[in-house]
Amino acid sequence: MKKLLAALLAMMMLLACVTAAMADEGSEPDWTAYDALISEVKAETDFAAREAKMHEAEDILMATGAIVPIYYYNDLYMQKETVDGIYANLFGFKFFQYATVEGSDTLRLNLASEPDHLDPALNSSVDGACLAIASFGGLYTYDAEGNLKPDFATGYEMSEDGLTYTFTMREGLKWSDGADLTAKDFEYSWKRAAAPETAADYSYMFNGIKGYPSDLAVTASEDGATLTVELDAPCAYMLDLMAFPAFYAVPQQAVEGIEGWQENPGAWANEAGFVTSGPFTLTDWTHNESMVYTKNPNYYDAENVKLEKLEFMLSADDTAIYAAYQAGDVDFIDSVPTDEIQNLKDNPEFHLIDNLGTYYVCFNVKSDLFAGKTVEQAAAMRLALSKLIDREYIIDTVGQCEQKPANAFIPEGMADGNGGVFKTNDDAYTYPDEENVGYYGYDVDVEGAIELLKEAGFEFDGEMLSANTPISFEYLTNESSGHIAIAECIQQDLAAVGITMTIRTCDWNVFLDDRKAGNYDVARNGWIADFNDPINMLEMWTTESGNNDVQFGR
């Protein structure tokens, strides 16, 4: 334990070094060094040096204690035996366009409750990405084996220095209203998504393109047949970006045809009937109840789309969702009540699939919880609370789906961009907890937590927090039995040493808005990688990122 405590203290010293340039005293880490390091990673052309910089970035991130990994994701779903052809990938994307339902031309399903955004540039949720895939398209996509393949493009050419890509568009592409879809639509869409005034959460994903954010070096040919993209540095995951929904095309005429579109850029897709380009169009939307997607006859591969309709039940109540599935009202669901999982594991309709991501708890670094503390003391508080969480218990009693406990933010199995796996000990890098290949062990460590809290100025009577120095905060989560059960486990773990945690549950959209705005102390969170490179899970914490829910640098 002493060895691990020393490693944690060393992490806090690292945090102290990177925050030494702070202009004002306070508990928030200065994030200038982290932002600069991510920029260096994006510009680095030596793969080994790039990997080293990404490890350095994760070291800084984990030293704050603001990210508390709980477990590494996998995914579950239930599918009637009459359904075939649905596929998913490591990034949580689900593809329904080639599904079939025996004896029916309609697939009835549930993914989530009311979506936050249907504009692919503004979406930031996995469920929203699945809806975007059903109704829009990008230059590339994924096949059933998880491999990249051309979609609205037919291929590309890359310059010898890796800095220029020229994509050739598929001929005859149409929007759902019959208008031509060309490279000019992609030029417009990317520049819109990157522009500060659009305020897209994923705008930072365009920052490897020259001219980001306001003068993106993306140019369509005069005839709209090709799209040329100029990069600041070679990008090994360029084609992965081409398959990501933020890079999908949206119709300029529809986007800008809504009154007040400048102030509300996603308003054009807030009701059924908006123009799409993918296999389906949204034709009916009863908000907070249901959505109906109908086959798009103008989709370039419409002849291979066998379904006529997708009917979505909108709900986050997994008890109601499972009841609907049992009653035969839906054919596909991807959540079930926690207390049903063990009974379902031998059911042939129950499926587990791999994901590349991390379920975690995040702290708002601007919370009053850390008022009066130094940067190092605030980090010690957060790291201490992490050591009190029984991850194995959460997995065994709540997750129950063979998840693995997490002790680093970057998940197991993620590539390192240099021909290997990132989360491993090797000659180039060794994790602080070498034995467990992470930043700390998996076991609850009450003694270590108490030592860290004492470092942060808290007093103890034995193993209980003294009434002289109480800790009390609120935990934010959305309305889902699994997420609430995890919150209750953490609440119990912290209560064992006298820490008071109350739980606030909200519906999905309120939860997202409050977490994004920093209206919380501690919140449940999770990130499934958008592509297989650590930079995806590191650049989301830059000051400018729309996914920086922790409020680093703000």
Residue ranges and their predicted role:
Residues D30, E56, K149, T294, ...:
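Append "and occasionally in soluble cytosolic enzymes with long acidic Gly/Pro-rich linkers
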Residues H117, N123-V126, I133, T141-N147, ...:
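Gly/Pro-rich hinge or "lid" segments in bacterial periplasmic/extracellular proteins
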Residues E157, E187, D201-G257:
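Surface-exposed binding/hinge segments that line
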